[in-house]
From Swiss-Prot:
<keyword id="KW-0804">Transcription</keyword>
<dbReference type="InterPro" id="IPR019462">
    <property type="entry name" value="DNA-dir_RNA_pol_bsu_external_1"/>
</dbReference>
<dbReference type="InterPro" id="IPR010243">
    <property type="entry name" value="RNA_pol_bsu_bac"/>
</dbReference>
<dbReference type="InterPro" id="IPR007642">
    <property type="entry name" value="RNA_pol_Rpb2_2"/>
</dbReference>
<comment type="function">
    <text>DNA-dependent RNA polymerase catalyzes the transcription of DNA into RNA using the four ribonucleoside triphosphates as substrates.</text>
</comment>
<dbReference type="Pfam" id="PF04560">
    <property type="entry name" value="RNA_pol_Rpb2_7"/>
</dbReference>
<dbReference type="Pfam" id="PF10385">
    <property type="entry name" value="RNA_pol_Rpb2_45"/>
</dbReference>
<dbReference type="Pfam" id="PF04565">
    <property type="entry name" value="RNA_pol_Rpb2_3"/>
</dbReference>
<dbReference type="GO" id="GO:0003677">
    <property type="term" value="F:DNA binding"/>
</dbReference>
<protein>
    <recommendedName>
        <fullName>DNA-directed RNA polymerase subunit beta</fullName>
        <ecNumber>2.7.7.6</ecNumber>
    </recommendedName>
</protein>
<dbReference type="Pfam" id="PF04563">
    <property type="entry name" value="RNA_pol_Rpb2_1"/>
</dbReference>
<keyword id="KW-0240">DNA-directed RNA polymerase</keyword>
<keyword id="KW-0808">Transferase</keyword>
<dbReference type="InterPro" id="IPR015712">
    <property type="entry name" value="DNA-dir_RNA_pol_su2"/>
</dbReference>
<dbReference type="Pfam" id="PF00562">
    <property type="entry name" value="RNA_pol_Rpb2_6"/>
</dbReference>
<comment type="subunit">
    <text>The RNAP catalytic core consists of 2 alpha, 1 beta, 1 beta' and 1 omega subunit. When a sigma factor is associated with the core the holoenzyme is formed, which can initiate transcription.</text>
</comment>
<dbReference type="Pfam" id="PF04561">
    <property type="entry name" value="RNA_pol_Rpb2_2"/>
</dbReference>
Length: 1368
């Protein structure tokens, strides 16, 4: 690894034993791919696949009017450009969207009434604006009305066919009732069930059930067709009153002989009466040449005819197909001399009489009767005719407009029924229904396994694209109705396509989906991990999904098919447990919506490099080995027997039988869980809490990556999109806190590409959860960067790695009861050094509207407000940046006109003297709410178009334009530099053909040689008209200048387009004149009551901040930072934290050694130490070859501790941790002697102490602390409102009242229950008394007592209060 690339990439000591087979895929790829497939934005119209928008338009169009005289046809759709950038949309409260335009064709036909044919009279084609559609940002989110939202993918039951049974609960006999259901995406559901009497019933859309054969007859099958399909036939011969059956191995196998059968020639007994026809018997019969097996006549009586039986002489029907042969019919057969008949083979085991029984029950004979019967059952009130009924059935299952199985449904149907219809066929076929019934009967006969609806082969993911597609379709169908009505109401000849199409219903549906759908959620933006996991979340709730109340235990449970697809750990605690889950690290969603996971292919016990992505239903019976199964150098398994999974069960199998192998140990868990080191040593419940709490961690002001990591940190930081990443290779030419300019290398593939990129960094932006989003550059000027390199860290990242918390020294010991019940004792140093300090940003908004009484005004001239309150406002009435504000301070001054009131003569006089102001306006300024104090860091002003801008607005705009100008100038400077270098390479040494002047001075005369030094003296533009003696070189030079002009013009155009937005003003909501947003930043220092946690679910609340001198300390005087309770470990079974603390201790002591060697400049020892630590990661020769400067730079990275990487399920072993502790000179037990800071005495026991990664969670005491003296009251009960948001009071329940009574605090209690609560008159009297200085309580009757008496009166009880004096 070159020294240059080591600069920004942290090297960690690796403990993983397994090679990386496949990279972790893009973590938010699912969102981007799904929406990309929906829009197909960059695809030319003619090459678009029939998915997403294209599919919807093609399915709804063409729209024909009711008379079929005109048709509106869809040609193509296209998108316009983006009007505002993402940042502008967030600031202005707009939606980040692009306009959609569709090209449609209106075709008008001439109808020939005599022949009934039509000919085209007129075609009009037009492109129409079709509303706007939100666009996904690069990070997989949407900006809707200025807020960043995520559309969560839904996990729902796939369409297709499902087989199930009732486990014998429905019928009293305990017989199991088997059923199946065909579920389409759109259209009617069909249920098929076999009742305990073996009759096949069907129901359509859960209506009344009917015999299944009625539907078969309605579809055009005759009784003979049905019987032929479901049964095999047997031929029966009648010879001289003896009855024989045709010899057939299949039908005889397993049956009993009803008569003795002998060898026709030798007379030997082949099978005795009552014995079973087994393999040997059948073989003997075959060799004996028996082709007719004798049976008893009574075996034929009761059999079912397979074909109609008639008297050949008279044509009289004796019995029809499907009838049972009675004794009378059998006698007639003998009388008429019928020698051969066909019966159905029914043995009661493999072949039952279900269909025959159903046919006898169905009572319809013809197709017409069957159609009318079904129509009447589904539409009971409507008059039925065969034509209407036929049309109805066709629409029900066979017309794509009304019935859609979807490609997934057809795939599942084919897979389950063994059919082979093309996936593009999305309606049912007649054969599918027959196959479904046949499969169901077979399932019942064999008592086979039914489908598990919780198996991931039967559940699929609907991502953003599909969810929006369904909504868009609803909108289009609404629009289709309106278009049809318009076409029939007006004369179509005079209309253009735009007169027919109104895109409002479609836009409304899209807006509703993004704004109010349960699956479109406000993004959890606490930290990069919470963003990433929110985008990878799968929810079983939402429209068309489950509800919390109805979801049972089975749906929520972990299923074997979740392996590698859904994380078994990460899910919320509470009512949503198991319904909201997370995608596993390597999982991806395929085109059909099924979750796939990668496996390595094993061929002849050799593990190949080939990777296969498999959905759950294809995994089936493949034996799959674990990722950590030992493999030799030749790629074969070391052990002859390997642990493998077969159909979800673990077993030991032969290495030669293994077909697939996991790619990585952490493919089982999600991203959050794979960030927990030693996860394998934690109990699942605590791991669940650990992965959930990492998402609540607040980004700190100073970040540091964990010393003990898992290697996934850099992947999350890269894919979350919070860090700034280089897109192309190049060199950093400029860096400051707000921007990075990178000059790119010449791209041979695209020589016209822009040679420079300016990366603008976000500074102190407020996130959705009020945390601070800030970029910090980590590159230096002159540094080389490759694509994918991190240029600037975002929130909670450090050197391109996720850094949610801090590495702190933790001791496990009790300390004065301050760590009782998971409390955490914290050292003062953490607070003093701002280790856990975080910055939070609040946004306050004020709007000046045009009211009925006049315009509101934002101004610094506010009536009845003292001068000291306005000291921080500027002349526009907006608070200055940098002002320290506290609750009640004015942020933006605003006055609102009051209604005119009758003035007294005195007021009139005052008004005349002091002017109009003051009296007719009221102060409605924006003030700082209680509980917020901080520094004003930004203010944004938006003015409506046509309204004059104030000074502050102009200042803000000038500042923004200055930044844009700087970007433009930097870009042009790099373009000029690149041009100069190209010209230098091209022209140096050439002879000049035209003179070159600088002002009036001639620098180059004709015929002079061009030198390299010349290019530094003369501006590049001077060379534009230069010609040299070589024509080809002159031509190349002109081409370079052409490129230069194109690039510079493009830069300038982009700049002009950007600043053109500043002139006119903003598009604000109706009635709004001006909108001001003020941002206040607050520093939150770690304080008592804050919630903290480790990564193993070990959470607690800070109980006390202890002075440094009282903390336990090491022999060298170093104090610990934090004291945790050792009793929190054994019962919780999260031992991972102990291993983490030991490895953290090793990391820290090794860092101390490196630090000491650096200070003492012992470079030889340092190289030895680094080689010993990084024995696998960096070749010893490379460390040996480092220069002193390079060595110091590299080693100083590890002064505070050597960073370790211990992957999940493949981490550091105990022996390795011990070896590292020994290497660092610490005790192998990981324990140390600590001294009590209060007494200076060593503690009796050795104490487990080391470095743990601790997080500060988003439950901060400053946000929860709240106090009230007076405030709002409820209207009915007149009691104070509840909660911090309502500025409410604290409720006292009956138990609190009992407690006060028990203490005998009668007066305090009376005050609580009256004046402090809902005694209105008493409140007023109390106020008056306090003003007069008489602190005497004078309570009255509480309002809630009056509410009670009113309720009693409503019940007819007359309740009156008898006052004391009335009594007397």
């Amino acid at each position: 690894m070159s020294g240059e690339s080591m600069l920004n990439r942290r090297i960690r000591k690796q403990f993983g034993k397994l090679d990386k087979i496949v990279e972790i895929p893009d973590l938010i790829g699912m969102q981007k791919e799904s929406y990309g497939r929906f829009l197909q934005q960059g695809v030319p119209p003619e090459k678009r696949e029939k998915i997403g928008l294209q599919a919807i338009f093609q399915s709804v169009f063409p729209i024909k009017d009711f008379t079929k005289s005109a048709s509106l046809e869809f040609v193509s759709y296209s998108f316009g450009g983006v009007k505002h950038s993402v940042a502008e949309c967030i600031q202005r409260g707009m939606t980040y969207e692009i306009p959609v335009r569709i090209r449609v064709r209106l075709v008008v036909y001439d109808m020939d009434e005599t022949s009934g044919t039509s000919s085209i009279r007129d075609i009009k084609e037009q492109e129409i604006y079709f509303g706007a559609i939100p666009l996904m940002t690069d990070n997989g989110t949407f900006i809707i009305n200025g807020t960043e939202r995520v559309v969560v993918s839904q996990l729902h039951r796939s369409s297709g066919i499902f087989f199930d049974h009732d486990q014998g609960k429905t019928h009293s006999s305990g017989k199991v009732v088997y059923s199946s259901r065909i579920i389409p995406v759109r259209g009617s559901w069909i249920d098929i069930e076999i009742d305990p009497k073996d009759i096949v019933h069907m129901r359509i859309d859960r209506r009344r059930k009917f015999p299944g054969t009625i539907l078969f007859k309605a579809l055009g099958y005759t009784v003979k067709d049905i019987l032929d399909y479901f049964y095999t036939k047997e031929r029966v011969f009648v010879r001289k009153k003896k009855v024989f059956k045709a010899f057939s191995e299949d039908s005889l196998r397993g049956q009993r002989a009803t008569v003795r059968i002998k060898h026709p020639e030798t007379g030997d007994l082949i099978v005795d009466k009552g014995r079973i026809f087994n393999k040997t018997v059948l073989k003997n019969m075959k060799s004996a040449g028996i082709d007719m097996v004798p049976i008893r006549p009574e075996d034929v009586v009761g059999a079912v005819l397979a074909a109609p039986l008639a008297d050949s002489s008279t044509g009289e029907m004796l019995a029809d197909a499907g009838d049972f042969i009675s004794e009378e019919v059998f006698e007639r057969i003998g009388e008429l001399g019928i020698e051969e008949l066909q019966i159905l083979f029914i043995d009661g085991a493999g072949s039952t009489d279900s269909i025959v029984k159903t046919l006898l029950l169905d009572k319809v004979n013809t197709k017409e009767e069957a159609l009318i019967d079904i129509y009447r059952r589904i539409r009971p009130g409507n008059p039925a005719t065969p034509e209407v009924a036929q049309d109805f059935i066709d629409h029900l299952f066979f017309k794509p407009d009304y019935y859609d199985l979807s490609a997934v449904g057809r795939l599942k149907l084919n897979h389950r029924l063994g059919a082979n219809a093309p996936v593009s066929l999305r309606t049912l076929r007649r054969e599918d229904l027959l196959l479904a019934v046949k499969t169901l009967i077979h399932l019942k006969n064999t008592q086979g396994p039914v489908d598990d609806i919780d198996h991931l082969g039967n559940r699929r993911v609907r991502a953003v694209g599909e969810l929006l597609e369904n909504q868009y379709r609803i909108g289009l169908v609404r629009m289709e109705r309106a278009i049809k009505e318009r076409m029939s109401l007006q004369e179509v000849d005079a209309l253009m396509p735009h007169d027919l199409i109104n895109p409002k219903p479609v836009s409304a549906v899209v807006r509703e989906f993004f704004g109010t759908s349960q699956l479109s959620q406000f993004m959890d933006q606490t930290n990069p991990l919470s963003e990433t996991t929110h985008k990878r979340r799968l929810s079983a709730l939402g429209p068309g999904g489950l509800t919390r109340e109805r979801a049972g235990f089975e749906v929520r449970d972990v299923h074997p098919s979740h392996y590698g697809r859904i994380c078994p750990i990460e899910t919320p605690e509470g009512p949503n447990i198991g319904l909201i889950v997370s995608l596993s690290t390597y999982a991806r969603v395929n085109g059909y919506g099924f979750i796939e996971t990668p496996y390595r292919v094993v061929k002849d016990t050799k593990v190949s490099k080939e990777i296969k992505m498999l959905p759950a239903f294809e995994e089936g019976e493949h034996p799959i080995a674990q990722a950590n199964a030992p493999i030799g150098k030749d790629g074969r398994y070391v052990n002859p027997v390997v642990i493998a999974r077969v159909a979800g069960e673990f077993s030991m199998i032969k290495a030669s039988d293994v077909e697939l192998m996991d790619v990585s140990p952490n493919q089982l868990v999600s991203v959050s869980a794979s960030l927990i080191p030693f996860l394998e040593n934690d109990d699942a419940n605590r791991a669940l809490m650990g992965s959930n709490m990492q998402r609540q961690s607040v980004p700190l002001a100073r970040t540091s990556a964990p010393l003990v990591g898992t290697g996934v940190e850099k992947v999350v930081a890269r894919d979350s999109g919070v860090a700034v990443v280089a897109r192309r290779p190049g060199e950093v030419v400029y860096v400051d806190s707000g921007r990075i300019v990178v000059r790119h290398d010449t791209d041979d593939k695209d020589p016209e590409a822009k040679p420079v990129t300016v990366y603008n960094l976000s500074k102190f932006i407020r996130s959705n959860q009020n945390t601070c989003f800030n970029h910090r550059p980590i590159v230096k000027k002159g540094q080389r960067v490759a694509p994918g390199d991190v240029l600037a860290d975002g929130p909670a990242t450090e050197k391109g790695e996720l850094a949610l918390g801090k590495n702190v020294t933790v001791a496990f010991m009790p300390w004065g009861g301050y760590n009782f019940e998971d409390s955490i004792l914290v050292g003062e140093t953490l607070v003093r050094d701002g280790v856990f300090t975080s910055i939070h940003i609040e946004e306050f908004e004020v709007v000046a509207r045009d009211t009925k009484l006049g315009k509101e005004e934002i101004t610094c001239d506010i009536p009845n407000v003292g001068e000291e309150s306005l000291v921080d406002l500027d002349e526009s009435g907006i608070v200055r940046l940098g002002a320290e504000v506290k609750p009640g301070d004015v942020l933006v001054g605003k006055i609102t006109p009051k209604g005119e009131t009758q003035l007294s003569p005195e007021e009139k006089l005052l008004r005349a003297i002091f002017g109009e102001k003051g009296g007719n306006v009221k102060d409605t300024s924006l003030r700082v709410p209680p509980g917020v104090s901080g520094t004003v860091i930004d203010a944004k002003v938006f003015t409506r178009r046509g309204v004059e801008k104030d000074t502050r607005t102009r200042m803000i705009e000038e500042e923004e334009i200055r930044v844009l100008e700087k970007n433009r100038d930097d870009e042009i400077a790099v373009i000029e530099e690149v041009t100069r270098e190209r010209l230098k390479a091209l022209l140096t040494g050439q002879k000049c053909d035209t003179p070159v002047k600088k002002g009036k001075k001639t620098i180059l005369a004709k015929g002079d040689k061009i030198t390299a030094a010349l290019f530094d003296e003369v501006p590049t533009s001077q060379f534009e008209k230069l010609a040299v003696t070589s024509d080809s070189v002159t031509e190349q030079a002109h081409r370079v200048f052409e490129w230069y002009r194109t690039q510079v013009d493009a830069c300038r155009e982009e700049f002009e387009a950007r600043i053109s937005r500043y002139g006119a003003g903003e598009e604000l909501p109706p009635g709004v004149i001006k909108m001001v947003k003020v941002y206040v930043a607050m520093k939150r220092v770690l304080s008592t009551g804050d919630k903290m946690a480790g990564r193993h679910g070990n959470k607690g609340v800070v109980s006390r901040i202890l002075p440094q001198e009282d903390l336990p300390y090491f022999e060298d005087g170093t104090t610990v930072d934090m004291v945790l309770n050792p009793l929190g470990v054994p019962s919780r079974m999260n031992v991972g934290q102990i291993l983490e603390i030991h490895l953290g201790r090793a990391a820290r002591v090794l860092g101390d050694q490196i630090s000491t060697m650096l200070e003492e400049k012992k470079y030889k020892d340092l190289k030895k130490k680094l080689s010993a630590v990084f024995n696998k990661e960096i070749p010893a020769a490379e460390i040996e070859a480092m220069s002193s400067a390079r060595l110091c730079e590299f080693a100083s990275e590890y002064k505070d501790g050597v960073h370790m990487e211990t992957p999940v399920f493949d981490g550091a072993k105990e022996a390795e941790i011990k070896a590292l502790l020994k290497e660092g000179g610490a005790d192998e037990t990981g324990q140390a002697i600590l001294y009590d800071g209060r007494t200076g005495q060593p503690f009796d026991e050795r104490i487990t102490v080391g470095t743990m990664y601790m997080l500060k969670l988003h439950h901060l005491v400053d946000d929860k602390l709240h106090a009230r003296s007076i405030g709002p009251y409820s209207l009915v009960t007149q009691q104070p409102l509840g909660g911090k948001a309502q500025f409410g009071g604290q409720r006292l329940g009956e138990m609190e009242v009992w407690a006060m009574e028990a203490y005998g605090a009668a007066y305090a209690l009376q005050e609580f229950l009256t004046v402090k609560s809902d005694d209105i008159a008493g409140r007023t009297r109390m106020y008056e008394k306090i003003v007069k200085g008489q602190n005497v309580l004078d309570p009255g009757i509480p309002e809630s007592f009056k509410v009670l008496t009113k309720e009693m009166k409503a019940l007819g009880l007359d309740v009156t209060l008898i006052e004391q004096q009335d009594k007397e």
